[in-house]
Regions:
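Nucleotide-activated sugar donor-binding and catalytic core shared by glycosyltransferases
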Residues: 1-442
Length: 442
């Protein structure tokens, strides 16, 4: 038997000491965060909802969890991650009805919108990741398996799931060199990733990054969001007010741009062009639409701007409008069906929103520069269906090519839109791949 070298023993001991210190420090950090949220809840509405929701967790679990049932636990941080996990939930309900679904959220923006999701048997917030709460939660639920969506690395949950030998999966994950797992000083955190039974990544680059730090429990399966947007399109939800406003398919139809998840920084980029081109129409779905936000949008675009909530009371308001503002939840992913060109917001701020929702309808998509975390932004541009911009001038150039009421612009819309749609269609199938690996073993 080979005697370990001193350097090897020293490295092993250093690693063991780091892990012994890391767990209590991490848990202390989570507890401190919890206290911080509680303090912030005095003035912050989102924090108030989070604290209020956490008070209800154990009552919800007591009422909804059937101790004799088998549960698949799916955790999504927020609404976007839920949409990524949704195709797998729907397939599970169809193919494996013997399982019940427990759905948890971290963010109020996910929980508040989907707390009554009909395909989940129980929906609640994820208890804070402290050892005591983790043990209590898993003792109560005792899931058959746990599925985390995209960016979820809750250290105590992962360790306890591993200790209890509960299969644990991360789906539609993306890894980048700038993440802390791959930094020299924090690379040792990579052992968290070994607690997953399997990690399903979106691309080969992510697999190679993980292999470089010794994580090999990885499959390249793609992104379930593509399956989700294809499903939304196939259901073909009709929105009569949008049809009346856009006059899609009618002789007097004018080019329509749909702006999804618009922020003030986005409006600074595109509003000026529309003032100069009265033979176009604009639909705006703001990311947030409180009264003050809507007032500012109406002031920016003037008398020709109508809110959907107003038009629902008097549909004739849209007949002479140039701008229609969608001031309600739940329509955006279907509303793209009524546009000729899409602009997806967030790229001039915190980060790009979902461009796949638009591209699936065979329309070209314009978006801002803060998109490096989204593989599809680069790939769609390479495919010829996406138009990344970095300035107002870039937007004007793209709009001049795609949005004019001319034959050449119509042809450009058709060609680039087809390329955007083809890109989406080339990415379908991630849900089936993941399902087969997890639930069709052997």
């Amino acid at each position: 038997m080979r005697v370990p070298k001193f350097k090897e023993v020293k490295g092993f001991m250093a690693e063991a000491c780091r892990q012994m210190l890391e767990r209590p420090l991490y848990s202390f950090g989570i507890s401190t965060y919890r206290v911080g949220v509680k303090v912030a809840s005095a003035k912050n509405a989102k924090a108030q909802k989070l604290i209020s929701g956490h008070k209800e967790i154990w009552d919800i679990l007591d009422k909804k969890i059937d101790p004799s049932a088998k549960y698949i636990w799916i955790h999504a941080a927020s609404l976007g991650e839920f949409e990524q996990g949704r195709p797998l939930i729907e397939k599970l309900k169809k193919e494996r009805p013997e399982y019940k679904i427990l759905l948890t959220f971290f963010s109020p923006s996910g929980y508040e919108v989907r707390k009554n999701y009909d395909l989940a048997d129980c929906v609640c917030y994820l208890p804070f990741d402290t050892p005591k709460r983790v043990r209590r939660f898993l003792y109560k639920v005792n899931p058959e398996c746990a599925i985390f969506v995209k960016y979820e690395f809750w250290r105590n949950y992962l360790e306890e799931l591993y200790r209890r030998q509960i299969p644990t999966y991360l789906i539609s994950a993306v890894f980048r060199p700038d993440q802390f797992f791959f930094k020299k000083r924090s690379a040792w955190y990579s052992y968290w990733l070994r607690w997953y039974t399997r990690i399903f990544v979106q691309n080969e680059d992510s697999r190679r990054l993980l292999a470089g730090i010794g994580v090999r429990n990885v499959d390249v399966c793609g992104d379930t969001r593509f399956d989700r947007v294809a499903d939304i399109r196939s259901k073909g939800r009709e929105i009569p007010l949008l049809q009346r406003f856009t006059r899609r398919g009618l002789p007097d139809h004018l080019p329509v741009m749909m702006v999804g998840s618009s922020w003030p920084a986005d409006e600074e980029v595109y509003s000026g062009w529309f003032e100069k081109h009265p033979d176009t129409r604009l639909v705006i779905a703001p990311h947030e639409f409180d009264a003050e936000r809507l007032r500012k949008i109406k002031a920016l675009f003037g008398e020709g701007c109508v809110l959907m909530s107003e038009a629902e009371k008097d549909p004739s308001l849209v007949d002479n409008a140039r701008v229609l503002v969608i001031d309600c939840f739940g329509l955006l992913s279907s509303a793209y069906a009524y546009c000729d060109v899409a602009y997806v917001g967030g790229g001039f701020g915190a980060g790009l929103h979902n461009i796949n929702e638009a591209a699936v309808y065979d329309v070209p998509v314009i978006y801002g520069p803060n998109n490096s975390k989204f593989i599809e932004a680069r790939e769609m541009a390479e495919a010829g269906g996406g138009f990344p911009i970095a300035s107002k001038k870039d937007f004007e150039k793209a709009a001049d090519m795609l949005m004019l009421n001319t034959d050449s612009s119509a042809e450009a819309r058709k060609e680039t839109g087809r390329k955007a749609g083809d890109y989406i269609r080339s990415k379908l199938g991630a849900t089936d791949k993941i399902y087969d690996i997890i639930f069709k073993k052997g």
